[in-house]
Amino acid sequence: MTTDYFTRKQSYSGFSDGADSPGSPLASRTNPLSSKVTSVLSASYADSDIRDALSLLDKRGIQNTAETRRQLRLDVHREVIESNGDIIREFGHVAEEASELMKQQEQMQAKQELLNAFNAHFVMSDDDIAMLTSTAEPVNDRFFSILSRAKKIQNDCEILLGTENQRLGLEIMEQTSKNINGAFQKLYRWIQREFKTLNLENPQISSSIRRALRVLAERPSLFQSCLDFFAEARENILSDGFYTALTGTTVGGDEDPSIKPIELVAHDPLRYVGDMLAWTHSATVGEREALEVLFISDGDEIAKGIQAGLDSEPWNRIAESEDEVGHFDGLKALNELVDRDVAGVARVLRQKIGQVIQSHEETIMAYKIANLLNFYRGTFQRLLGDDSVLLDSLATLEESALRQFRALMRDHITSLQAETQVAPPNLSPPDFLHEGLKQLTAIMKTYETSFTSPETREAGFEPILTEAFDPFMKGSENVAKDLSAPRSTIFTINCLLSARATLAPFDFTISRVSQIKDTIEEHAATLIDHQYIFFLEKSALQPLLQALSATTDIRDHPVFQPASLIQASQTLDDFLPSALMDAMENLKDLQNSMLVRQITEEAAEKFCDDFEKVEERLMKADEEREESLDEKDGEPHHVRALYPRTGGEIRVLLSIRIWNMFKTWRLEIT
């Protein structure tokens, strides 16, 4: 302050550096002496600064001399500079320490910020830990948010484990893992509580439980335990529902008036079994749809969670095969869960249907039940896949029904074999064959309604034909053995025709129909031969044919002597008027008129061919006789004149008469 005062006063007292020199413009206007006087007079000596300055000058013992006044300013500046230098020297180390402290402060601030960031990222608050692990806290969006943060902390701890000091990372990872495990345990117990009150019939299933399942899937063991609990609960619910549907009363004994009990139709086995299977199918479809909403509606998030859990727990996969570890099949898991839910229903279903199968001894009913079971087995196979407890139960029941069907068929065949079976007088199919074919028709109509694939349809019905068709045809063959020819052949053809008419309308018996057709043709060939022989014998053509085959020169053969030829010609003429009538009479018991016509035509054709051979041989014999005789021997003896009928005449007569006789015969049969 004193220094400032002296500096300021010097500018007023004339100790300036010549600012008011005579050469300046101001000097030309003002007298220097006047300025100094004015400056002195204008100063207030009552000012404390002036007094302090004067007191200081007095203490320094400064003499008021011209030299002193000239040096005073310099001395003051020098002292000021020296004072400042002393101050700088004295406070230099303080400045250094202050700078060091500022650097330390910056470092501390950086460490504090790093610590805060570390705590914010890696350290969870007590409230967050309580939200994760305490069962008193709800499972809400905040819970899942904190759990996501905890999992992120656990993953980021890998960075800390990469540092030189791994202790911090290990401690944080241990604590975080403990918190996460506690959170999953809390989530597991919460889902179990929710499952107890879950209503799958409600189309708006809580989104929170779906989210909880997606998260819990990251712990496959807990997720599987949860599914086991759920499956057991649903199995009990569906079993109770099936019991109510069967009886109309709940497990507790309360009657439900809104339900018509299935057991009311127990007197109708097929409807009873069908209603039980229909209820099971409806329940299975509803269960699957509800579980799709619960487990698959959010895409493959659960599958991703389970896969992530499997990847993070390799020790759980040591005993598993590579196929099981490689990929989680969500659809297969869903099918398995649905199958477990209906396992209780499957047990009751197996018991009830098994009782129906064993208590009814109707052959057709047993097969209809087997066919119904086959239909539902295919339906459930498309719904649940190939590996299913319900499918196994249905397959077992189907096999049981087929065994019952086969056993009843064998018993029926055995009873028929014990009876003496004879062919009816008109050689029509016997009653037991009619009964068997009628039964087979009912079976085929039932099989026709099944959803068997076209590729396996015919092969699938072949075992049924073996049980329900072949024994009856075998019985018919045994009856035919007791008949003489051609009655046995006619009886056999009638049975085959009836069988073919029964099988032909169905597309899954084409092979059998073709086999029957071939067999009919074989037996028809036998009848053709029989009719052919009949034509030969009754027309007296057979001795002529035999003679032609035995000798080359017929002139000396007894059969071709005039008397024999005249007798043969007369026999032929007597035969022709009634030939077709007699031939038709042989086949009057054959029940297919078109087949009768075909057999007769072919036999007549063979007869005409043989007659033309005889005619040709007789004409040739006459020509040879004419060449061997001389003119003087007289006219030759012509054998052809003794046997005048021609092949053309025979063909015309038979072709015309066969039509007329066939029409007359059909009218008589009709």
Swiss-Prot record:
| GO terms of biological process kind | intra-Golgi vesicle-mediated transport; protein transport
Q: Name one Pfam family in it.
A: COG6_C
Region named Disordered: 1-32
Which UniProt keyword terms apply here?
Golgi apparatus, Membrane, Protein transport, Transport
User: What this chain does, per the record?
Assistant: Acts as a component of the peripheral membrane COG complex that is involved in intra-Golgi protein trafficking. COG is located at the cis-Golgi, and regulates tethering of retrograde intra-Golgi vesicles and possibly a number of other membrane trafficking events.
Skewed-composition ranges (Polar residues): 1-14
The protein, known as: Conserved oligomeric Golgi complex subunit 6
What is the topology of this protein in the membrane according to its UniProt annotation?
Peripheral membrane protein
* Species annotation: Sclerotinia sclerotiorum (strain ATCC 18683 / 1980 / Ss-1) (White mold)
* Cellular location(s): Golgi apparatus membrane
* GO cellular component: a single term: Golgi transport complex
Tagged with keyword Transport: yes
Q: Which InterPro entries match?
A: COG6, COG6_C, COG6_N
Which residue ranges traverse the bilayer? none
Judging by the UniProt lineage, the source's domain of life is Eukaryota
Q: Which family does it belong to?
A: Belongs to the COG6 family.
**Gene label:** COG6
